[in-house]
């Protein structure tokens, strides 16, 4: 399964680009293992590719192999994990764009809930 999302941002440093890829990979791996036991996963590969030109392109590719007896829709699980990774990366990039800098990966990996106004 592969998805590409185009994100418009000012130019990021090499360290920030690496951080984006690492965050996406960590979110995907954690999501998969939140839904499957490690013993249920025979093989897993998570690849993040980032291309920065006029736009910032993040391509995530995920492969998960489980034994036949594991009753899970692997494609749906991968889709959900990728969607979650894009949400977390988007939040991280918004923080960077607002000038908050690298407030820590842990904050970027928390659930995305904005405080209610009013």
Curated annotation (Swiss-Prot):
SUPFAM superfamilies: Hypothetical protein MTH677. Residues 98-118 are annotated as: Disordered. Residues 106-118 have a biased composition (Acidic residues). InterPro entries: DUF3194 (IPR024502), MTH677-like_sf (IPR035954). Belongs to the UPF0440 family. This is Uncharacterized protein PYRAB15120. It comes from Pyrococcus abyssi (strain GE5 / Orsay).
